Design a protein with these regions (language model features):
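Acidic/polar-rich alpha-helix caps and helix-coil junctions
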Residues: 1-55, 72-205
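Acidic/Gly/His-enriched mid-domain segments of enzyme catalytic cores or analogous surface patches
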Residues: 64
Length: 205
């Protein structure tokens, strides 16, 4: 109910295809239209983006063509606006890196797209998911009437929250034993260890 209330408030709007023609980065366009709550980091590019997304850094967040094909699937790898606009390929390189935080100083905490995913999951109504997909390039690819809605929602989470950390909490909430593509059980990783200072000074046993 709360997700629908946010959507229907009219205060936020999903990206339109015409907005992609602007000379702006994907991160900037999303932050201006779809961010409900975010953190402003004044030195995002200088202090952080250069490390994880900069041209010369050895710690860049790379993603290979093969991995992109797995994440976006078919026909998404060819039509998905995120796949087309969110990654950067530098001259002479074969791997893309995430360009989501180029030209923007905001880290998303809550986005309108997540409201659509929550509404779809809570109601079981695939029209909420289809609306989000329409605003990501899938307007000519409607979901099948008999689609596995849970699987489709998970696939959308994997595409929508790249380099944001939100997917971890989706898996944690659903208590996935193992993450896709991984063999190690996740149970022990869902709860972070208590900080040493908390144990020492917090009277915690």
């Amino acid at each position: 109910a709360c997700a629908k209330e946010v959507i229907e408030s009219g205060k936020f709007s999903l990206l339109e295809e015409k907005q992609l023609q602007q000379d702006e980065t994907w991160g900037y366009l999303c932050s201006e239209n779809e961010y409900i709550s975010s953190l402003y980091v004044y030195d995002m590019e200088e202090g952080r983006s250069d490390v994880f997304f900069g041209e010369e850094s050895s710690m860049r967040c790379y993603i290979s063509d093969a991995r992109r094909s797995v994440v976006f699937g078919s026909p998404g790898v060819d039509i998905d606006w995120r796949n087309q606009n969110m990654f950067v390929l530098k001259t002479g390189e074969t791997k893309y890196y995430v360009g989501k935080y180029q030209g923007v100083n905001r880290i998303p905490l809550l986005k309108l797209s997540e409201m659509y995913l929550i509404a779809a999951e809570a109601s079981g109504d695939k029209s909420w998911l289809q609306t989000l997909r329409d605003h990501r390039g899938y307007v000519n690819y409607p979901l099948a009437d008999d689609c596995d809605l849970t699987a489709e929602i998970e696939a959308e989470y994997r595409k929508e929250f790249i380099a944001e950390g939100q997917l971890f909490y989706y898996y944690k909430r659903l208590n996935y034993d193992k993450l896709p593509g991984m063999s190690e059980p996740m149970a022990k990783h869902y709860v972070f260890p208590m900080p040493d200072n908390e144990l020492e000074f917090g009277n915690i046993k």
